[in-house]
Amino acid sequence: MAYASRIINHSKKLKDVSTLLRRENAATIRYYSNTNRAPLNREDTFNSRLGYPPLERISICSTSTLPVSIIFSTTRSNLSSAMGRPIFGKEFSCLMQSARGFSSGSDLPPHQEIGMPSLSPTMTEGNIARWLKKEGDKVAPGEVLCEVETDKATVEMECMEEGYLAKIVKAEGSKEIQVGEVIAITVEDEEDIGKFKDYTPSSTADAAPTKAEPTPAPPKEEKVKQPSSPPEPKASKPSTPPTGDRVFASPLARKLAEDNNVPLSDIEGTGPEGRIVKADIDEYLASSGKGATAKPSKSTDSKAPALDYVDIPHSQIRKVTASRLAFSKQTIPHYYLTVDTCVDKLMALRSQLNSFKEASGGKRISVNDLVVKAAALALRKVPQCNSSWTDDYIRQFKNVNINVAVQTENGLYVPVVKDADRKGLSTIGEEVRLLAQKAKENSLKPEDYEGGTFTVSNLGGPFGIKQFCAVVNPPQAAILAVGSAEKRVVPGNGPDQFNFASYMPVTLSCDHRVVDGAIGAEWLKAFKGYIENPKSMLL
């Protein structure tokens, strides 16, 4: 009766599911046993009328699992608008992957297994940075359970339902937790907390055997076979002598013989067809006594150039940066276009605007803010560069979202300024400063870095780098590398006249599958036009 009452209470909590679906975009997944696969019901019909995708029914081979709806809430209230955005930039849900179970036994009351959420498009695993709740604490919807370190940033993970935190499966500091792997258990009733003290989630138990699988032993046995040749087969050496003057030996045997000044012609091989192997060299050195004199000198030489070093573990952001950039260089056919842009008028306009900003107490506008604005307007003129490659088609985006590279102590981040072509310089400057600060504090949220269609990387202003080539940020088709401005002598009007002008080199890296050379040159021409005539950006 106690379990029946719990099921009835839980059913009451779910009576407003239809209302919840009206307020939030959600995907409902019902778990049925193999013997209880239900047909479409009223909620399925309701979801289809709202335009949600068909519900996925997953059978779990368990006789102790009852059909219960589990709701994964998304971060946006309008899913249809997100579908028009880049596929890699849509608002990914901070999914708290969970599974609710009811046990027929007395040791397992109703509980919920909370899995590692998928917090970014590229996330496959995460780390538990900090638990904000302890075992036994009461939790409510919207409260933060823990902080998860993703491949992009550290994100707070919120609780979805009311209850009590019965068990923390993955302790604080746990690393490389696969998406969906159970990290905590919650229960509805406080008295059920103690029953999960020694509980091991089924997903964790299932994963253990795969990790514990030892490396097969046969390959190691093959290595032992060669040096284990006994001395007895020496009698068979003359039966397979090498023909001619050529001496057949393995590369390792040749190297060992060379290091110890051993003539190969003095050794008869015991390998296939009389081939000299390492065991033959070792036996020769042992019998002649050369091994004792030659090896100490080698070890003495090897100790002399000893290196002092420290091994730094890979952070999550470093792993993702390495894998994405390696993927980019290996799969994207890069080409590079460089042009010099005169920035005298740009610097003059910036000085005028900053004088107005200072008078009104506002923040100054940086050269990088003007570069971001010019890049966004050039993308509006040449939309082919605002695209992405897929195997079946080229996707051209209507939104101009500019990622801005920010270097921090934790690694490289690329937060995004969305709809940069429609924003003013002050707004762009404020957003870039805010995003850069959040990146340095490691507090970026998924919506702060997802959805970019083009990237700007500036090493000129902060570091004085004259010119460089950046790696395309997949799945984007282009990235702009901005160098430092320098004064140059340029010809004047007369034959003996000259002037000074400041030039800033920029290099456009393109994906040749999407952007042809002429299209990339057209974009650079448009960008240069905005930089050299900056007032046109204000129109």
Swiss-Prot record:
Residues 204-214 have a biased composition (Low complexity). Residues 1-102 form a transit peptide. Its cofactor is (R)-lipoate. Keywords: Acyltransferase, Lipoyl, Mitochondrion, Transferase, Transit peptide. It is an enzyme of class 2 (transferase). Gene3D superfamilies: 2.40.50.100, Chloramphenicol acetyltransferase-like domain (3.30.559.10), E3-binding domain (4.10.320.10). InterPro entries: 2-oxoA_DH_lipoyl-BS (IPR003016), 2-oxoacid_DH_actylTfrase (IPR001078), Biotin_lipoyl (IPR000089), CAT-like_dom_sf (IPR023213), E2/Pdx1 (IPR045257), E3-bd_dom_sf (IPR036625), LAT1 (IPR006257), PSBD (IPR004167). The keyword ATP-binding does not apply. The active site is at H512, D516. One of its GO terms (molecular function) is dihydrolipoyllysine-residue acetyltransferase activity. Residues 111-187 form the Lipoyl-binding domain. GO terms for biological process: pyruvate decarboxylation to acetyl-CoA. Residues 195-247 are annotated as: Disordered. It catalyses: N(6)-[(R)-dihydrolipoyl]-L-lysyl-[protein] + acetyl-CoA = N(6)-[(R)-S(8)-acetyldihydrolipoyl]-L-lysyl-[protein] + CoA. Residues 248-285 form the Peripheral subunit-binding (PSBD) domain. The modification N6-lipoyllysine is found at K152. GO terms for cellular component: mitochondrial matrix; mitochondrion; nucleus; pyruvate dehydrogenase complex. Pfam families: 2-oxoacid_dh, Biotin_lipoyl, E3_binding. NCBIfam families: PDHac_trf_mito. The pyruvate dehydrogenase complex catalyzes the overall conversion of pyruvate to acetyl-CoA and CO(2). It contains multiple copies of three enzymatic components: pyruvate dehydrogenase (E1), dihydrolipoamide acetyltransferase (E2) and lipoamide dehydrogenase (E3). Belongs to the 2-oxoacid dehydrogenase family. This is Dihydrolipoyllysine-residue acetyltransferase component 3 of pyruvate dehydrogenase complex, mitochondrial. It comes from Arabidopsis thaliana (Mouse-ear cress).
